[in-house]
């Protein structure tokens, strides 16, 4: 663990074409950058890298390869605060992106995502992860922009950047983030590439995500979809694939996202009943009754649970 914390707080020196003076927004932007260590189930380190927060709720972006096969991950912010990654929000293996959320009860510093795609030959700044040895932005230009998905940019920058710039944000003059530096195609590449952060922010799970091989290659719990109908589909498809503790957490997340719906409580009551936690099951059925508009449906669900319970051998 000491090795992991050391890597998180002391990333290697980064080289590049540094500006003579950082823009006025640099210090604030640097606080949103994070160092990341991914681990296996035993807590052994798999990989280390960097990324950055894109909203105050602890949502961040990094490269997908960094999280592949990981069971756990920890991050340290530019302010020196340590967080645990609690959920994977979405992925794109095609664009080597992962969107994830850390566990926090306070606002996190975050970069502002530009609503512009940017224009060719626009001056930009590349922000390396700040260290004592390297606290300066890198000057660059948007040499070319390829549009994808109708409104997002895949950027070619004017000069090559070291691999240690991977996942660094590409900022415009106003201090808003346009892109994230991508992995080099080959060691002799004379340019660098960045993918739209606005596109990365569109990555979410959906009802069919439990069958997504790219998501399943990351063994960290997934964030639930935003739509309740999608959550029900996700839970149905996840039930046989997830460990009981993970599935229980999904049910807790469901109740937290939709506290005024009776469905998360009846589903969690079913789970508790199946695992012999009858007091918790009764508590959830009462909670479902409190919020239900159609109370007859809750009575039916409860009676069904009691019937199934009485069919169990040895139950009296």
Residue ranges and their predicted role:
Residues 55-125, 132-136, 151:
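Conserved active-site neighborhood of the chymotrypsin/trypsin-like protease fold
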Residues 230-232, 264, 298:
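TPR alpha-solenoid repeat register
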Residues 21-22, 39-57, 63, 82-84, ...:
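A conserved glycine-rich beta-strand in the N-terminal activation segment of trypsin-fold
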Residues 21, 25, 108-154, 158-165, ...:
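Flexible, gly/ser-rich surface segments that form the specificity/activation loops bordering the active-site cleft
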Residues 259-260, 293-294:
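Short coil turns that delineate tetratricopeptide repeat
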Residues 239-241, 274-276, 303, 308-315:
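Short coil/turn linking the two alpha-helices of tandem helical-hairpin repeats
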Residues 22-26, 108, 180-245, 250:
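C-terminal cap/linker of serine protease catalytic domains
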């Amino acid at each position: 663990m000491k090795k992991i914390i050391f890597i998180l707080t002391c990333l290697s020196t980064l080289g590049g074409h540094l500006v003579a003076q950082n823009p006025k927004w640099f210090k604030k932007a640097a606080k949103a950058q994070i160092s990341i260590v991914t681990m296996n189930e035993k807590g052994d380190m798999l990989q280390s890298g960097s990324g950055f927060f894109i909203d105050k709720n602890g949502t961040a972006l990094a490269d997908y390869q960094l999280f592949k096969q990981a069971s756990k991950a920890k991050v340290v912010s530019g302010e020196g605060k340590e967080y645990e990654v609690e959920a994977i929000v979405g992925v794109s293996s095609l664009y080597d992106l992962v969107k994830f959320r850390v566990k926090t009860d306070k606002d996190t510093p975050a970069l502002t995502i530009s609503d512009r795609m940017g224009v060719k030959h626009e001056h930009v700044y590349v922000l390396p992860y700040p260290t004592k040895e390297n606290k300066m932005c890198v000057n660059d230009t948007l040499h070319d922009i390829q549009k994808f998905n109708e409104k997002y940019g895949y950027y070619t920058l004017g000069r090559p950047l070291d691999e240690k710039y991977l996942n660094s944000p590409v900022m415009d003059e106003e201090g808003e983030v346009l892109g994230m530096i991508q992995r080099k195609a080959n060691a002799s590449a004379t340019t660098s590439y960045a993918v739209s952060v606005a596109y990365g922010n569109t990555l979410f799970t959906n009802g069919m995500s439990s069958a997504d091989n790219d998501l399943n290659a990351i063994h960290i719990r997934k964030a639930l979809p935003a739509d309740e109908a999608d959550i029900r589909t996700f839970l149905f498809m996840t039930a046989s694939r997830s460990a009981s503790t993970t599935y229980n957490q999904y049910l807790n997340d469901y109740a937290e996202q939709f506290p005024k719906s009776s469905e998360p409580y009846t589903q969690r009551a079913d789970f508790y009943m199946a695992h012999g936690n009858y007091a918790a099951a009764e508590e959830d059925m009462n909670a479902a009754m409190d919020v239900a508009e159609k109370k007859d449906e809750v009575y039916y669900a409860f009676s069904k649970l009691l019937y199934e319970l009485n069919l169990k051998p040895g139950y009296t």
